[in-house]
């Protein structure tokens, strides 16, 4: 009788453990830094610090360096591809704005994926307030909505986080 009770208790515990398992798709070693109402998951390494100000999903690598990743969504007035978003919306602002020495690094640009969507990757350098920066934008479009994942770091520390950022881009997923 004691064996039967022990077996039933064990089966009950196992059933509870299996039924209570949450369906968490967070990749190992990462956490979700997306805002609660975002249409996507922005998975970043555990050691990165989420920074979700003004409804923009983001995280930075550490409090010293401030290398960061952000994701913004853009609803254009007309259907827009990733390439047209960069060329028609972003590029004019960068070239005519406050970024001095702006230069696209064409050999680092190309096709990629973001959350299962075809995307374009753009890498460029510039100076702002006397500091040299390097930025990578990964842009995907559903036609109606444009998603823009941006990684920015000082030129001196950019390479320190590119492996993390490649994992962030790879893990990005729509809800």
Model regions and ranges:
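N-terminal targeting sequences that direct proteins away from the cytosol to non-cytosolic compartments
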Residues: 5-11, 15-66, 108-114, 128-132, ...
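Conserved polar/disulfide-associated segments of primarily extracytoplasmic proteins
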Residues: 54-141, 146-147
């Amino acid at each position: 009788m004691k064996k039967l009770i022990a077996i039933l208790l064990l089966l009950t515990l196992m059933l509870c453990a299996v039924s209570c398992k949450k369906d968490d798709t967070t990749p190992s070693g990462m956490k979700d830094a997306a805002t609660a109402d975002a249409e996507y998951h922005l998975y970043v390494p555990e050691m990165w610090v989420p920074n979700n100000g003004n409804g923009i999903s983001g995280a930075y690598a550490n409090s010293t360096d401030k290398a960061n990743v952000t994701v913004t969504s853009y609803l254009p007035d007309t259907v827009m591809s990733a390439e047209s978003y960069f060329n028609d919306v972003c590029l004019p602002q960068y070239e005519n704005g406050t970024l001095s020495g702006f230069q696209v690094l064409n050999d680092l640009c190309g096709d990629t994926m973001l959350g299962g969507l075809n995307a374009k990757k753009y890498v460029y350098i510039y100076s702002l307030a006397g500091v040299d920066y390097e930025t990578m934008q990964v842009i995907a479009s559903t036609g109606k909505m444009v998603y823009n994942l941006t990684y920015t770091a000082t030129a001196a520390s950019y390479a320190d986080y590119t492996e993390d950022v490649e994992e962030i881009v790879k893990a990005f997923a729509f809800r």
